Amino acid sequence: MAYYHCLLFDVDGTLLDFNASEKAALSEMFEHYGFDRREEMQRRYQEINASLWAALERGEIKQDKLVVQRFEMLFHEFDIQAKAAEVNEFYLAQLAARADVFEGVQDILQELAEVATLAVVTNGVERVQRKRLDQAGLTKYFDGFFVSSKVGATKPSRKIFDAALRELGVENREKVLMIGDSVKADIAGGKNAGLATCFCNFSGQDASTVKATHTIEHLHELMNIVMEPEELANVGNPEKRHQV
């Protein structure tokens, strides 16, 4: 029996390479609308976007306003006459078309799904996240999909975790692990909900001040945290997997 019975996953920066997807989607957007000063615009967009998502996590802005306002602010700075809502829809469509999966994710989820309940907990745009996970072939491994805009609560609020565990029928929080790359949203959020946490430090940053239960540098390390030795011994052997 796995040590953790329920695994809650963030999406961007944890399962999917958001940086690669964002860069490609922005490039398509710049090309489509013929925007100049692209490197400078991309840098400013990312700064504005990060500040607004931080505001979302603090409960200061709603997602539907955020996704348009980031382009309004960008176009104002660069004196661009363009419809922010229209550009945002084009950008989200390009982003949704990307399924940049971190190496080995599908195999890892397949093994973990045999020993635990898996679910997604994300602050991202629901239609974008669902399509990207579908295209990546990952949706089938999850028993639940919990997005902040639908639940009405944003990570790091414990309310989104409470809603997820309630719907999944999970009562013992000691057996739940929140897995993500955001110290503020995922690690602090998981702790707010009384959960063990796993910090995905895929960029190799200094994690000495991150107060997570576990820290990993590649997702495959998660199997050593979740699985018992007997289960680890049967990884890749479907005939013996259910004999443990």
Features from the language model and the residues they span:
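Asp-based, Mg2+/Mn2+-dependent phosphohydrolase catalytic module
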Residues: 1-7, 20, 110, 121, ...
